[in-house]
């Protein structure tokens, strides 16, 4: 595990703020573009990142009928992004169509297709939310597993899950299935609205490929120092466990 496995969200309101954050953390390779920034400045953000040789995690969490998600995934892939998300609850047909569309979109520009990964369930939700609000009669870990298996069976590259589900998904889905984990909080940071969090070191030990770490880095007075502390915490834990 190294800094290339950390994804920092560009959870900022506009292009100027995005550029400022990117330049403040030059060592970060992976940046996540979510709904707020994409709605604010559109595909221009992709050019900004590519000019700086960054990799792009486009996290718009597509969720619609099969024809619509296929169209939007084809368009997204044609921009040359590296990772792309779709909700597993869009269903098997939509997932399969989206995966095929990603290949088609990448072919248009002659580039390697992005890896399409499924949102299993939002990391802000709890077992109680699943049972009482969403009326889903499964324990949360089982539900996440079923969504991940649906994604894998539909040809997707991986899934987004909380760190607490990583160990089970890695065991069942295998080493080639990409696991991306938001809801990661270092030992010294507040959990906030993430209900199923672990520390970066714990998530890595469980089998995560990429860690999405936002506010513990970006909401601090010194983001570079926060990033250094996170890397130090991970490195120290790995040395202790070796």
UniProtKB/Swiss-Prot annotation:
Reaction it catalyzes: orotidine 5'-phosphate + H(+) = UMP + CO2
A matching Pfam family: OMPdecase
Pathway: Pyrimidine metabolism; UMP biosynthesis via de novo pathway; UMP from orotate: step 2/2
Swiss-Prot/TrEMBL GO biological process terms: 'de novo' pyrimidine nucleobase biosynthetic process; 'de novo' UMP biosynthetic process
InterPro entries the UniProt entry points to: Aldolase_TIM, OMPdecase, OMPdecase_AS, OMPdecase_bac, OMPdeCOase_dom, RibuloseP-bd_barrel
Residues annotated as catalytic: 61 (proton donor)
UniProt keyword Protein transport, yes or no: no
Function field: Catalyzes the decarboxylation of orotidine 5'-monophosphate (OMP) to uridine 5'-monophosphate (UMP).
Subunit structure: Homodimer.
Family to which this protein belongs: Belongs to the OMP decarboxylase family. Type 1 subfamily.
This protein's name: Orotidine 5'-phosphate decarboxylase
């Amino acid at each position: 595990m190294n800094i290339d496995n950390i994804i920092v969200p560009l959870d900022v309101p506009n292009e100027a703020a995005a550029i400022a954050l990117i330049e403040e953390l030059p060592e970060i390779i992976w940046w996540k573009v979510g709904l707020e920034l994409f709605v604010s400045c559109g595909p221009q953000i992709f050019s900004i990142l590519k000019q700086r040789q960054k990799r792009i995690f486009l996290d718009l969490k597509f969720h619609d009928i099969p024809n619509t998600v296929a169209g939007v995934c084809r368009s997204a892939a044609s921009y040359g992004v590296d990772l792309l998300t779709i909700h597993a609850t869009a269903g098997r047909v939509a997932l399969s169509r989206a995966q095929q569309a990603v290949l088609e979109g990448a072919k248009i520009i002659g580039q390697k297709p992005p890896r399409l990964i499924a949102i299993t369930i939002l990391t802000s939700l709890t077992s109680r939310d699943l049972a009482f609000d969403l009326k889903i009669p499964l324990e949360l870990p089982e539900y996440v597993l079923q969504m991940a298996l649906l994604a894998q069976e539909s040809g997707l590259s991986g899934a987004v899950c909380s760190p607490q589900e990583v160990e089970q998904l890695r065991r069942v889905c295998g080493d080639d299935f990409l696991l991306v984990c938001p809801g990661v909080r270092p030992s010294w940071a507040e959990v906030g609205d993430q209900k199923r969090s672990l520390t970066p070191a714990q998530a890595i030990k469980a089998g995560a490929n990429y860690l999405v770490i936002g506010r513990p880095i970006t909401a601090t007075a010194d983001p570079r120092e926060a990033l250094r502390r996170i890397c130090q915490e991970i490195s120290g834990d790995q040395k202790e466990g070796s």
